């Protein structure tokens, strides 16, 4: 941890006692701040709340008392990224002119380790995991490590406080929720894998707001830093060029004009062959793109082709992201629960040459699934739909001419139905194309239940 004066002696309100709220509170205490922690949940029996109270934090649970801002002056409000800006406490802080920041900004300002940041609508977690493993392979030769932190599930504050040293590297996954509140981060390399519409618009309200939040990943970089941009998304690229001072390098699915691109047989950096495509374990063109971005970041940070090959030739996927689960009677089963929108489902469905039995459905967020019709025609032999969107997806399947369409209420029934339809040589693909919140708390929980139900079939 780097000693900084920014938060020393400051009166700070931390909003939300999740894992990141707990971690950033401990870091801020170490940096000399005075803390109040507030969560609308009852914290009377919460062990984390007790631990913070024992360290001198004023803990207030059970409500969001906006009159706190009338009782005393706060220098900062550190909010959980998932808490919307319409929250009464956040709105009151804004009204009072209190700077509103999030955990990543606090943690990265105190990091003595250099860091790189990755964001995007789809693919950021896989890209972060690949980058972390490549860089760890490289750094271990020197006795150091790379850590995958941030939106991937490990609070940056926790690693900055307890693990990472000056010769280590933080590979940071950042969501649009985290980036929206950022006012000062400077990654050595920033990357935006892709940006699609219809993602988190319930939080950001407009697509422009969503893009602006994503662009914060490189907005505060210097000319000595690097920014990796998707050459194939020209409208976004134009905005990236205006947003960052860093040197922009581009990547593309097939255009050799880009700095990094997917060639005929190799992932390329200019004329240099970086990795043989046939040796990459992850399926799908989108994972070649994720691999390409990881290669770009890692090579800029010093890793060699031996480090890249060691990881890409063995890495089989992140949980819930086109994750291979098992083979049932000759049917390969994949868990793509992270597919919470149409774009993510599209890349998953396109990833296989074998006939697919698709299991899809979930929360109805107003998506129109007609854009999947042509894709269904080319790849899907049968479909099982469930959840709030079951009839909408079934209707799209009918338009595609799919003859075998099964509509069920829940995921458990869906797994059983899909397994009966799939034959040896097929792929059973769970790619919901919808958020999980109609029946599950998170896409991770949804994916865990999918794997559980598949394993139950395997044991019969």
Curated annotation (Swiss-Prot):
The gene is murD. It catalyses: UDP-N-acetyl-alpha-D-muramoyl-L-alanine + D-glutamate + ATP = UDP-N-acetyl-alpha-D-muramoyl-L-alanyl-D-glutamate + ADP + phosphate + H(+). InterPro entries: Mur-like_cat_sf, Mur_ligase_C, Mur_ligase_C_dom_sf, Mur_ligase_cen, MurD. It is found in: Cytoplasm. Cell wall formation. Catalyzes the addition of glutamate to the nucleotide precursor UDP-N-acetylmuramoyl-L-alanine (UMA). It comes from the Bacteria. This is UDP-N-acetylmuramoylalanine--D-glutamate ligase. ATP binds at residues 120-126. The keyword Cell division applies. The keyword 4Fe-4S does not apply. Keywords: ATP-binding, Cell cycle, Cell division, Cell shape, Cell wall biogenesis/degradation, Cytoplasm, Ligase, Nucleotide-binding, Peptidoglycan synthesis.
